Amino acid sequence: MDIDPYKEFGATVELLSFLPSDFFPSVRDLLDTAAALYRDALESPEHCSPHHTALRQAILCWGDLITLSTWVGTNLEDPASRDLVVSYVNSNMGLKFRQLLWFHISCLTFGRETVLEYLVSFGVWIRTPPAYRPPNAPILSTLPETTVVRRRGRSPRRRTPSPRRRRSQSPRRRRSQSRESQC
């Protein structure tokens, strides 16, 4: 089977492969980031988003892979074979997990569309011959280029909603407090 873990999110393995391997933080740093930013949602029994689900699965699979590699390292007598296993896990599997964790954390942090635009613009930049491309690579940011940042000072006058535009109070439109705080 040829399964692309990014397909349902509008990306592909090839699109992420344009980013160099040293672009992605270590798995430990990514796991710490996911825990710091999204621990409540990841540990919640409720479904928050497909990105949360994918992150949960990646974190569980990484834990299983580490358990397996620890077992192999403990039970493999030949040091050369042990080093080959560790090297393979770190270079091949480690990179795949770093890409997967980075993608889903970035989508939750910046928004899926922003991440996809970044991947496309980086892919175009990296394939452009150095003589014809700008010296700096695109940067993933929460602020699109068209955003205008206002100077400090008086904030603009806020509009109060008119009575005609009240939100419906029907039960199907209300959200539970616990879900809002976790996701």
UniProtKB/Swiss-Prot annotation:
InterPro entries: Hepatitis_core (IPR002006), Viral_capsid_core_dom_sf_HBV (IPR036459)
Pfam family, one: Hepatitis_core
A GO cellular-component term linked to this record: host cell cytoplasm
Basic residues: compositionally biased ranges: 149-176
Location of Phosphoserine modifications: 155, 162, 170
Spans annotated as RNA binding: 177-183
This protein's name: Capsid protein
